[in-house]
Amino acid sequence: MNHSTGNCSSKENFSADTTADLKVEEVPEAVINTLSPRREHFTRSCSGGGPRCNRESLPGMVTQRSCVYGGARVVLMPITDAAHLVHGPVGCAACTWDIRGSRSSKSELYRMGFSTGLEEKDVVFGGEDKLLECILEINEIHSPSAIFVYSTCVSGVIGDDIAAVCRTAENKTGKWVIQVQSEGFRSFNKSLGHQLACDVILRHIIGRGDAEVRENSVNLVGEFNVAGDLWEIKGLLEKMGIHVVSSITGDSTVAEISEAHTAQLNIVQCSKSSGYIAEEMKRKYGIPYINVNFFGIKETMDSLLSISDFFDLNAEERISSMAEKTHEMIRGYRRALEGKKVAIYVGGNKAWSLIRAFRDLGMEVIMSGTQNGLPEDYLKIMEKSGRELILFDDANPVELSELLRKYRPDLVVSGAKEKYLSYKLGIPFCEFNHDRIKPFSGFGGFLNFAEEVKRTLESPIWTLASKKRLSGPGGMSGEA
């Protein structure tokens, strides 16, 4: 019996010309080998779009993200003369103590950690009495200008009426006692915590002072004085005759922020954490704002020129002279760093500003990722890069180690959580987030950054410890 059909009964039906026209598209190589639900979080910029982002982390993935409470804490904590009381288990306060790395020229109270230390019995019987007792004790011992009370997951779940306790405490102490409704479970993205903290500043602090309006006055919004960055920026502004009313929130006091509504301009350094404040102050007080970036020579120069244009200061020649002098000073660093490859894993705003900075040093960014990036962040990264690079979102330690092992950058730029992973792989690491000890903002700060990168890459340790590669999650073996 013949089972063949008329359509495909024999090879003779396929001509040589037909087979020559058959084309099979090449399957693109995966960026790294990871779980299938995570593959879209890793991409190449040449594919035309960024990675999948702004999504809940995959359960069990050991994400390196922070929570809503952590997002609120990093915005408010740099207010130097306030007490920051965490209404939750002691671990919540411990994990975020000094998390910002902010420096102060005023009070050091903000660096003290306060927690109600909720335990099992408080979950059963409630923690309101404990909270009130803690607030009264803090006020008696430290007499802060204000007390911020942070909600956490536990206090949110058990339903403590923190707002009522804060009102009672205000009546008893005469101080501002302000609830920050920052339960960690409210969102997968800490950016909600940023907005909640901004709401607290807008509703409870800004507008309560009564200072006179001064000429050429600004607020520095979204500047947290990490390692003294604020002081570098203020120095540049003062040379131009600019008066800084307040910094929101680095090296600030409650009184200074209460007078922020008297400024003539808001200059926004980190739009993701504090752009919301600038928008609301424009709506409520009519204060215009401009976005600035004081990391890198070109970015610092452009930011100062924008401020100069707003106030009609005619400072172009002075600003250009400072920028040119800085270019002259980094030439030696550029010769030493030319052609080195860099991997970046930082916040969205930092990621794209670093690309231009490394270009000034003759270095090439080959991969860039963020923990809480938005689509527009990745688009800006691609725009600033102008070349193909690996993009990734919310990478866990195993994924990050695979990226570094596969693409072998000469330098990793990230934060404390990634430092020791990089060291274990034998790759030089530069701290850019909150644990660094030198300012990187402004012209002087960029020289510090160039020196830090050069010193890191030229450390003798890398001649003694050859680069390794991970053999798996549990160990390390083999040469790169």
From Swiss-Prot:
Assigned keywords, A-Z: Nitrogen fixation
Gene3D superfamilies: Nitrogenase MoFe cofactor biosynthesis protein NifE, C-terminal, Nitrogenase molybdenum iron protein domain
Origin: domain of life: Archaea
GO molecular function terms listed in the Swiss-Prot or TrEMBL record: nitrogenase activity
A biological process term (GO) from this entry: nitrogen fixation
InterPro entries (alphabetical): Nase/OxRdtase_comp1, Nase_comp1_CS, NifE, NifE-like
A Pfam family assignment: Oxidored_nitro
Pathway info: Cofactor biosynthesis; Fe-Mo cofactor biosynthesis
Family stated for the protein in its record: Belongs to the NifD/NifK/NifE/NifN family.
Function: This protein may play a role in the biosynthesis of the prosthetic group of nitrogenase (FeMo cofactor).
Protein name, as recorded: Nitrogenase iron-molybdenum cofactor biosynthesis protein NifE
Organism: Methanothermobacter marburgensis (strain ATCC BAA-927 / DSM 2133 / JCM 14651 / NBRC 100331 / OCM 82 / Marburg) (Methanobacterium thermoautotrophicum)
Gene, per the UniProt record: nifE
